[in-house]
Amino acid sequence: MTGTLYLCATPIGNLEDITFRVLRTLKEVDLIAAEDTRNSIKLLNHFEIKTPMTSYHEFNKIDKAYQLVAKLKEGKNIALITDAGTPGISDPGEDIVRICYEEGVPVTSLPGAAACITALTMSGRPTRRFAFEAFLPRDKKERARVIEELKNETRTIIIYEAPHHLIKTVTELYNALGDRELTVCRELTKKHEEKVQATFSELLERSRTQEPRGEYVLVICGRNVAEIAKEQQESWEAMPLEAHMAHYESQGIDRKEAMKLVAKDRGVSKRDIYKQLL
């Protein structure tokens, strides 16, 4: 019989946030695959868990995944944990899950802590729709592309950042997105947990006197939909009317329908467009 891969969420700071189900599973499985065994041994020792461990991290995630899947196919049950939070959420996990599905190995996820959701729910920002970006790319070109995409993102944006990169990241976001409001969460669930509601400029001013410390989650307001619509309308209004018509007619849209679309874009009636085209 094939074993099961258990994705086990671990605390992001406060050890009391671990679930009874995760503790039971970590004790019952045959092997625990940990992102960093040196960190995870502290968690296991605290809860007196003696299950053997092996490393599974960013730099061995493919080769090691196949080794672990082979053990699963032999009938072994394996738990996957990361240093903090839920496997696969800005941490190793997605690759071994994909390989398990390809090999017909069962996977189940044991819910628990995730810094992005913890920060979002207490941010005071809209929670119904959000875009999780984790850490922005370090590659300069890719980073610029992602930040450019965020300019017109209307959903709440969640970004992770380390203290030594915080000022650089906030400065880049400020320059690209404007002075947005955000909630800054630091050291979540830990003794020195801190939440600050500010704008990018206020956060940069604050950083002049307070050196960034700890891990950060930035929960940023999305762009206002009405603002985007207004900007788009102004863009259409600046375009010559015939060029605006040609924009739609070049797509195979007949002139009558194109007039309707142009009128909508410009916030005027179809009759107004007709008169201007005479």
Spans of features found by a protein language model:
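Glycine-rich, flexible N-terminal cofactor/catalytic loop recognition
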Residues: 1-59
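A contiguous loop/helix-start segment that scaffolds small-molecule binding in enzyme catalytic cores
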Residues: 2, 156, 163-278
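Short glycine-rich anion-binding loops that position phosphate/pyrophosphate groups of nucleotides
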Residues: 12-13, 83-87, 163-165, 223-225
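Glycine-centered tight-turn and secondary-structure capping sites
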Residues: 92-94, 255
